[in-house]
Amino acid sequence: MMLITTSHRPTRRTRSFGHDLERVIPNSLYLTRGKKTIQELLMEAYDRGYERLLIINVWKGNPLKMTFIKVHPEDWGYLGYLYLHGVKLQREMGFKGLNPIREDMPLVITTAKRVGLDHLAFAQVFSELTTGKFVPRGDKSLLSIADRYNTDVLAVIERHPRGIVINFYRLDITKDRPVGPLINVKIWIMEDGRRWDYKEAFGIKVPPRRREFEGKRGEGKNSD
């Protein structure tokens, strides 16, 4: 599904986050970046048969941004970006040493039962970024959705006071609670112009200086 790596000189927490994603995104691989360029990463992803390259960027020791890139020898390109408030690792949720999923199964992306249009829109966006399968929740249980699509792993989009949360479930591990990682998304931006910012959505005013700083911070920590 995707090759997962980081920006240069990642922190231990960022590497752990990458490994956690490898454990909940089927047929994915976490790769230590080293000195590899974007082009070298794309070629490695293509040689391994992946459709996506995910690069995790760091800010003050924590994962700041997730950059998704389409893998194609002649038509590669940036697809979109998730800016994060923070993450909660699997070990912080009580799960250690989970094995990656090497079976051929879809990553099903759905929502909690009572969410707004913003959450539905993001669930569809996240499915595009990951090549996952978006399934509207309705009144269905997670177990019934998983059974219908023959999968053990679901990404559930949920409400959060400071944005949108992605919670991952591994039903082969436990059917009672998510295993993580938990990802708190504050902004998402797609290259085709679609975007969402929790401050704008919640009517929070941002001082001009802070807005300018946040923009530069995101630019300064790009994927290369």
From Swiss-Prot:
Key words of the record: Ribosome biogenesis
SUPFAM superfamilies assigned to the protein according to its UniProt record, in alphabetical order: Class II aaRS ABD-related
GO molecular function, one term: rRNA binding
BP-aspect Gene Ontology terms: rRNA processing
Keyword Acyltransferase in record: no
Domain Brix as annotated: residue spans: 1-196
Disulfide bonds: none
Alphabetized PROSITE patterns for the sequence: BRIX
Statement: the UniProt record of this protein carries the keyword Oxidoreductase: no
Function: Probably involved in the biogenesis of the ribosome.
Protein name: Probable Brix domain-containing ribosomal biogenesis protein
